[in-house]
Amino acid sequence: DTHKSEIAHR
Protein backbone atom coordinates (compact mmCIF):
# COMPACT_ATOMS: atom_id res chain seq x y z
CA ASP A 1 0.00 0.00 0.00
CA THR A 2 0.87 3.70 0.11
CA HIS A 3 -0.42 4.80 3.50
CA LYS A 4 1.27 1.90 5.29
CA SER A 5 4.30 4.07 6.04
CA GLU A 6 1.96 6.79 7.28
CA ILE A 7 -0.01 4.57 9.64
CA ALA A 8 3.20 2.94 10.82
CA HIS A 9 4.79 6.13 12.14
CA ARG A 10 1.47 7.59 13.32
Curated annotation (Swiss-Prot):
What main location does UniProt list?
Answer: secreted
Please give one Gene Ontology molecular function term for this protein. Answer: lipid binding
Q: What UniProt keywords are attached to this protein's entry?
A: Calcium, Lipid-binding, Metal-binding, Phosphoprotein, Secreted, Zinc
- Record's keyword annotation contains ATP-binding: no
Specify which residues bind Ca(2+) according to the UniProt entry for this protein: E6
- Tell me, how does this one assemble? Interacts with FCGRT; this interaction regulates ALB homeostasis. Interacts with TASOR. In plasma, occurs in a covalently-linked complex with chromophore-bound alpha-1-microglobulin; this interaction does not prevent fatty acid binding to ALB.
- Which family does the similarity line name? Belongs to the ALB/AFP/VDB family.
Supply the name of the protein.
Serum albumin
